[in-house]
Amino acid sequence: WGCGGNMTPEYYANEYRRYQTYVRNYHPDRPIKKICCGANVADYYWTKGVLNTAFDHAEQWHGFMDGLSLHYYVHPEGWEIKGSSTDFDADVWYKTLSKALYMETLIERHGAIMDEYDPDKKVGMIVDEWGTWYTCEPGTNPGFLYQQNTVRDALVAGITLNIFNKHSDRVKMAALAQMVNVL
């Protein structure tokens, strides 16, 4: 789905099953974890399609995976115009926090789909991209995706980490994108 891949969930899952075969554990003390590309935000169709195909005739519970990823960014003004990281009013402040709370809905709904295929929760939800994402700061290189963080971002992080903790039976790993992807 992402970065121009333009794949259907079924096609991707078949490709995933094919190529994961060649990713093997070579050291018993350092097992490789296979993470399947999951949904962007509320694309429940993707989650259902990938799991349905990946788990079809799969050995026992795992659908050839240890985790399924999920991406969600909080951008208060929308994807095209994300809003300023430092110049915002109270309305945008509350809108940002409200959108942070949406992470719980995403985890619950994607988790419910995962439960259909993996009721024992052996496949982890891997929220490998999350956080706030605003319009690049004026005067900075847009390719570097620099944004100044504020107390508002700390509250988004606190809300989100609390949600992850609450759903730790399914969420097994999370990566704040600003730490990993230089936002």
Regions found by a protein language model. Name each.
Residues 9-161, 167:
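Noncatalytic carbohydrate-binding groove/subsite architecture in carbohydrate-active enzymes
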Residues 1-3:
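Hydrophobic or amphipathic alpha-helical targeting/insertion segments
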Residues 157-183:
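Catalytic cores of secreted or luminal carbohydrate-active enzymes
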